[in-house]
């Protein structure tokens, strides 16, 4: 694990948050939708980014199996009852499977690594394919972190 890659910030006021961030001078990526119900927009900084996540398609949120971490389900649950703010810290890694093993050795609850790809529109309008391989860890003492 090399360091902090980005934070995930949940919001039910996605358009208003994007307008506020643009108004104070940030450039955001165009809104994108994930195939599992969530959508996002990013503020990309040098070596770090902020991911604003919302739930445009709650009917697409799958219920995770016991050994799976449900990114969409976790964030949908986080936003219940008005939950807003940083829901996740995401660290850099070149090897999700090795990170999962490290999490197990540290006594954290782990899940099967999760990989997906999607088209992403860049600020200049270009569409590129982006892909991710993720290892998730949770701990009972931190149910909302």
Regions flagged by a language model, labelled:
Residues 18-78:
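Glycine/small-residue-rich interface belts in oligomeric ring/scaffold proteins
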Residues 2-13, 41-46, 49-51, 62-145:
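Vicinal oxygen chelate
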Residues 14-27, 99-106:
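Amphipathic alpha-helical segments
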Residues 6-10, 15-19, 51-57, 111-115, ...:
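Generic detector of short, locally flexible boundary/turn motifs and exposed helical patches
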Residues 1, 13-16, 23-25, 59-65, ...:
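N-terminal start-of-chain detector that recognizes signal peptides
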């Amino acid at each position: 694990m090399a360091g902090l890659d980005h934070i995930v910030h949940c919001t039910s006021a996605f358009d208003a948050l994007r307008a506020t961030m643009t108004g104070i001078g940030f450039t955001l990526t165009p809104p994108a939708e994930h195939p599992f119900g969530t959508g996002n927009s990013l503020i990309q900084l040098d070596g770090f980014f902020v991911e604003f996540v919302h739930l445009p398609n709650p009917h697409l949120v799958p219920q995770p199996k016991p050994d799976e971490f449900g990114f969409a389900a976790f964030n949908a649950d986080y936003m219940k009852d008005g939950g807003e703010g940083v829901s996740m810290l995401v660290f850099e890694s070149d090897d999700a499977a090795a990170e999962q093993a490290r999490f197990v050795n540290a006594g954290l609850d782990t899940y099967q690594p999760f990989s997906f790809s999607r088209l992403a529109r860049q600020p200049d309008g270009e569409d590129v394919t982006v892909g991710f391989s993720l290892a998730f860890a949770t701990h009972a003492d931190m149910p909302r972190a």
